[in-house]
Regions:
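Generic structural hydrophobic/aromatic packing signal, biased to beta-strands
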Residues: 1, 13, 22, 49-50, ...
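Short, basic, glycine/proline-bearing loop/turn elements
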Residues: 2-11, 125-133
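Catalytic or ion-translocation cores adjacent to nucleophile or general acid/base/metal-coordination motifs
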Residues: 3, 7-90
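Conserved NTP phosphate-binding and transfer environment spanning the P-loop NTPase/kinase superfamily
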Residues: 61-64, 71, 76-358
Length: 358
């Protein structure tokens, strides 16, 4: 994240599939080291991160010149790249939501395709698969960071965890401390999308957005996180984000596509101690005035106090229901770190105390 002057601050982010990982890495005006796997190690009192991959692999649906200009330009200009499950016509790739009219025939995942073609069950086959993908070199991106291949790594000042949550989590919050941050990351839930094989809209518990890739028991994994943080003199701050909060009456998203730029800029200021925050039951929240100034300066948007209240109100009953689900999800799991159970009980107590007070 590019801060004031020449200051550059590095963050790691973890999201389940189709929850904002690549779009966060591609925020306009900032740079990308990698969009997938990072290797973290404590070196010289800092947590250092290196990119262990040469490319970026993402969902291509809805990549268009308005919302994803850098990726779109990279995908539509000559270079080495890989497409999968797109529509091909006259040697050119097309995908859903690309911002232009699609051909009425071509080759796709069903073979020879034409408009109104149906599968064996009588369902209309779309021009391209909803989970179509692209693979490109990181170095081909205009916003590639100069340290993308730096073997010494970059210092991590913040770690961000986010999921797809339509009714509970605020857009951005800093956790109370490392221990609380590990607990919140372990409690991550996300609603399923077309990027998974599950039924869309189901809420899945996905600790650290990494459940499918764990090679050790979850209790050991959480303990590893806790111990890792204790060893770092310059401990990164842990943040939670949610780009998918909706108005429960209209069903419309409360966040714009580019709002994540503001959340990241606020985090950048936070880790450098340049903005204060409101201590809440679920972490430190931004002050309205700080966000208003960032929206005005970087997006030329008049960010209203009404929007702030809608986005950052603590939905206590929803949070309590969430942590009850987390309590049930971890019940019966042996050898959970004592710190995790302490944080869970304290989190529930803070929410109940707030309910009584407010």
């Amino acid at each position: 994240v590019n801060g004031p002057g020449d200051r550059k601050t590095y963050f790691t982010c973890a999201f389940p599939s189709s929850c904002g990982k690549t779009s966060t890495a591609m925020i306009p005006g900032h740079t990308i080291v990698g969009d997938d796997i990072a290797y973290l190690k404590i070196k010289d009192d800092d947590v250092k991160a290196v990119n262990v991959e040469n490319g970026a692999f993402g969902i291509i649906r809805d990549v268009n010149p308005d919302d994803d200009p850098v990726i779109y330009k990279t995908l539509t200009t000559p270079r080495e790249l890989i497409f999968s499950n797109v529509l091909v016509k006259d040697g050119k790739p097309y995908w859903l939501g690309m911002g232009k009219e699609l051909p009425e025939e071509g080759i796709n995942f069903s073979g020879e395709w034409y408009k109104s073609k149906e599968d064996k069950n009588g369902n209309e086959i779309p021009p391209a698969h909803k989970n179509a993908r692209y693979t490109i070199k990181i170095s081909d991106l205009e916003n590639c960071d100069e340290n993308y291949d730096n073997k010494k790594g970059v210092p991590v000042r913040g770690m961000v965890f986010g999921g797809r949550d339509s009714d509970t989590s605020v857009p951005v919050a800093e956790t109370l401390n490392w221990q609380h941050g590990v607990f919140m990351a372990s409690s991550l839930e996300s609603e399923t999308t077309s990027a998974t094989l599950d039924k869309q809209g189901e809420r899945k518990h996905n600790p650290m957005a990494n459940l499918d890739f764990l090679s050790v028991p979850i209790s050991e994994y959480i303990d590893n996180y806790l111990e890792f943080g204790k060893k770092a003199k310059n401990q990164p701050s842990i943040f939670t984000v949610n780009y998918f909060l909706k108005d429960q009456n209209s069903g419309k998203y409360l966040n714009g596509m580019l709002d994540k730029k503001i959340w990241m800029l606020w985090m950048e200021k936070r880790v450098h101690g340049e903005v204060d925050a409101i201590k809440s039951p679920i972490g430190y929240l931004p002050y309205y005035e700080d966000l208003r100034q960032l929206f005005t300066r970087y997006l030329s948007i008049d960010y209203t106090e009404l929007s702030y209240v809608e986005q950052f109100s603590i939905r206590i009953e929803n949070y309590l229901a969430k942590f009850q689900r987390i309590k049930e999800a971890f019940s019966g799991i042996p050898n959970l770190p004592e710190e995790f159970e302490t944080e869970l009980n304290m989190q529930i107590k803070r929410l109940k105390d707030a309910r009584k007070k407010y």
